């Protein structure tokens, strides 16, 4: 699932009333009244040759958790299914019979959908790979389709 990011991020474009480009936790705090949903990349960042790597998953979780902390310090209550997904996968060995594919897009999209529908604002931090992540694209498309403000930390492409 690919999006036309240049169209979404265009100043004065069709989505400019909903999309804030170059946002940050302070701006999110000024515009958020409710739960923020932090959409961060995962699947493409945590694999090599279609094999899930816990070391990469841990790094992705830390990078996304850093953004949760930055929002927390700005007094924004935020959830990040990427962090919950990563940490659940890190714990798989502690639960008998737990077999979940960390790279199963459809499973994780369905699992995270109930969190997404509670969001009052969608935040996409500038974590490497955000533009190519199918889950981030799904989240942003859903937000735009449902009139939920989108805050992109990345600036306009040069």
Show where each model-derived region lies.
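Conserved catalytic or regulatory cores that recognize and/or transform ribose-phosphate-containing ligands
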Residues: 1-158
